[in-house]
């Protein structure tokens, strides 16, 4: 046993690693990397791209404000994540091409992305308005979180993108051939592709204790208004999200293999596109109800196991004691049944991939899509 090694078997540490670039233990190749990079510095000096007399004139004093509409930033959500152009400003000021930058709490590896981007003429010009100090910096990034490494390794790694495109498109085609019907509706006898669906919860009236549709009572669709206070259709009492409870019903969960109290959701709107154009479908017809029933039966037959969220069930985060997490105990609770069928099928296809580098990139593609697939999805242009 050596200092810095995680507690675990050697085989497990090796399986978690991607040597020589990433190791789940002190990296024995680190000194070799640094020695090679130091040699490269000499070549850069001969080419006039760096100076042995480089001096920093003073601290970086400008205000930094970077927009977050950046593909690197938006690919995955991660706390403390910073757009890489913000980091580039510091690197271009404090370092020169070939310098080695170390980030020991790297998170998703945006320091590494910034170090590479310092060699991108377009990005440097957008930041500095001139080409001075342009050139790649070398980055050593480290983080304890496996999810952070998963993101960082792809953002800072080299992959065969042609191979990835072919495989990812093949997976999508295969899944759509099998489950494309989930995202199809019928409009005036014409097949249409579902862009998104709106589902509504049910509310328990604080006065008569009867349950009713939140959408039907709170939403004025014609005027694009969602009322903060809405009336119970049965007794006329005023209700609101602050004072009224959500309706829960006992369901058998086929994935958890147990009866559970869960929110019943009702389809209220379908946004679609067809040959005739785009539109909204407010009244579901029999083909929609048949499709929903087919989704239910397909979901019941899924061959997958339940995974407790963070291994804690509902006792996660800072607000679970208020009951906010009620009904969100397992990972599959975060998905509608329709989307979970698709997510499960795509993941099964990725798991079949034997090329480990390609599999890593496919998993990156898969995890990057989750923010648009689970119930926490929101409007984010």
Each language-model region and where it sits:
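Class I SAM-dependent methyltransferase "Motif I" SAM/SAH-binding loop
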Residues: 105-109
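Nucleic-acid modification enzymes, centered on SAM-dependent nucleic-acid methyltransferases
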Residues: 1-104, 114-381
């Amino acid at each position: 046993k050596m200092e810095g090694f995680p507690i675990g078997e050697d085989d497990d540490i090796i399986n978690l690693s991607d040597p020589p670039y990433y190791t789940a233990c002190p990296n024995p190749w680190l000194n070799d990397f640094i020695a090679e990079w130091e040699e490269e510095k000499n070549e850069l000096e001969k080419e006039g791209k760096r100076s042995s007399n480089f001096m920093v004139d003073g601290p970086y004093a400008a205000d930094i404000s970077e927009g977050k509409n950046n593909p690197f930033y938006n690919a995955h959500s991660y706390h403390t994540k910073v757009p890489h152009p913000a980091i580039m400003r510091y690197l271009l000021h404090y370092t020169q091409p070939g310098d080695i930058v170390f980030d020991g709490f790297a998170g998703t590896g945006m320091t590494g992305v910034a170090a590479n981007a310092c060699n991108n003429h377009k990005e440097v010009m957008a930041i500095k308005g001139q080409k001075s100090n342009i050139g790649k910096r070398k980055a050593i990034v480290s983080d304890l979180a496996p999810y952070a490494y998963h993101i960082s390794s792809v953002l800072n790694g080299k992959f065969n993108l042609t191979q990835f495109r072919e495989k990812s498109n093949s997976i999508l085609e295969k899944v759509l051939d099998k489950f494309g019907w989930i995202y199809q509706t019928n409009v005036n006898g014409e097949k249409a592709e579902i862009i998104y669906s709106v589902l509504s919860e049910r509310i328990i009236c604080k006065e008569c204790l009867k349950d009713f549709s939140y959408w039907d009572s709170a939403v004025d669709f014609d005027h694009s208004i969602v009322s903060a206070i809405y009336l119970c259709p049965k007794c006329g009492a005023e209700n609101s999200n602050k004072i009224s409870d959500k309706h829960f019903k006992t369901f058998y969960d086929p994935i958890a293999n147990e009866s559970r109290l869960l929110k019943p959701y009702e389809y209220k709107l379908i946004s679609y596109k067809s040959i005739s154009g785009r539109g909204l479908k407010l009244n579901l017809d029999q083909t929609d109800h048949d499709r929903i029933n087919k989704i239910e039966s397909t979901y019941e037959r899924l061959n997958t196991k339940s995974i407790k969220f963070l291994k804690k069930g509902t006792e996660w985060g800072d607000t679970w004691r208020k009951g906010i997490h009620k009904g969100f105990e397992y990972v599959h609770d975060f998905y509608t049944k329709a989307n979970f069928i698709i997510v499960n099928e795509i993941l099964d296809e990725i798991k079949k991939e034997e090329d480990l580098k390609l599999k890593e990139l496919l998993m990156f593609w898969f995890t990057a899509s989750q923010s648009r697939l689970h119930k926490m999805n929101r409007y984010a242009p």
